[in-house]
């Protein structure tokens, strides 16, 4: 875990516990993602990190647009001058939420876009293999030539043509 992850985790955990207790997981998830995207914007990050404007002032400007509890959460982060780690807080919140809901993320890389039925079949197979709900994130990379590379947590399943060619090459060279 990096230093930012260590700092972000208690915020994410507190946000999750509050949102879960008050049946606000989806709402807080969206709010955290929205603020995460805002902070990733260079102009917003420049304002938040500006020595002339405090992070509290930035959050106070949003008070009327936000739910009181979410505002209080942001105010706490701003008081501790941690607004710039909002993307990490949002990511950790999603990870905690996924564990709670028995969901795992599968990063699936394909050589080209494919039929929805094939993706549904792949999702069903992965759910059986891992015993949980799978949230698939699809990436297209023509360099794999064909097939797929699936990453779920620390597990990598490489059934790509380029992966098979690399294995064949290493066998032939050994």
Swiss-Prot record:
- Keyword entries, A-Z: ATP synthesis, Cell inner membrane, Cell membrane, CF(1), Hydrogen ion transport, Ion transport, Membrane, Transport
Recorded GO cellular component terms are: plasma membrane; proton-transporting ATP synthase complex
Name one matching Pfam family.
OSCP
| Location (main, coarse) | membrane
Compartments in which it is found: Cell inner membrane
Q: How does it sit in the membrane?
A: Peripheral membrane protein
The GO terms this record gives for MF are: proton-transporting ATP synthase activity, rotational mechanism
Q: Which SUPFAM superfamilies match?
A: N-terminal domain of the delta subunit of the F1F0-ATP synthase
Tell me its family.
Belongs to the ATPase delta chain family.
Quaternary data: F-type ATPases have 2 components, F(1) - the catalytic core - and F(0) - the membrane proton channel. F(1) has five subunits: alpha(3), beta(3), gamma(1), delta(1), epsilon(1). F(0) has three main subunits: a(1), b(2) and c(10-14). The alpha and beta chains form an alternating ring which encloses part of the gamma chain. F(1) is attached to F(0) by a central stalk formed by the gamma and epsilon chains, while a peripheral stalk is formed by the delta and b chains.
Q: Explain the purpose of this protein.
A: F(1)F(0) ATP synthase produces ATP from ADP in the presence of a proton or sodium gradient. F-type ATPases consist of two structural domains, F(1) containing the extramembraneous catalytic core and F(0) containing the membrane proton channel, linked together by a central stalk and a peripheral stalk. During catalysis, ATP synthesis in the catalytic domain of F(1) is coupled via a rotary mechanism of the central stalk subunits to proton translocation.
Name the UniProt record assigns to this protein: ATP synthase subunit delta
* The organism of origin for this protein: Francisella tularensis subsp. holarctica (strain LVS)
Gene name, Swiss-Prot/TrEMBL: atpH
């Amino acid at each position: 875990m990096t230093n930012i992850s260590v700092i972000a985790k208690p915020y994410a955990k507190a946000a999750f516990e509050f949102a879960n207790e008050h049946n606000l997981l989806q709402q807080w998830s969206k709010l955290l993602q929205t603020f995460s995207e805002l902070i990733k914007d260079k102009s917003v990050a420049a304002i938040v990190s500006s020595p002339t404007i405090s992070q509290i002032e930035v959050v106070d400007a949003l008070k009327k647009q936000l739910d009181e509890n979410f505002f209080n959460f942001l105010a706490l982060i701003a008081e501790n001058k941690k607004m710039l780690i909002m993307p990490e807080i949002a990511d950790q919140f999603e990870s905690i939420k996924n564990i709670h809901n028995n969901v795992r993320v599968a990063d699936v890389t394909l050589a080209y876009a494919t039929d929805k039925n094939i993706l549904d079949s792949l999702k069903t197979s992965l759910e059986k293999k891992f015993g949980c709900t799978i949230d698939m994130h699809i990436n297209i990379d023509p360099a794999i030539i064909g097939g797929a590379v699936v990453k779920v947590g620390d597990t990598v399943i490489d059934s790509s043509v380029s992966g098979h060619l690399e294995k064949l090459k290493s066998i032939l060279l050994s």
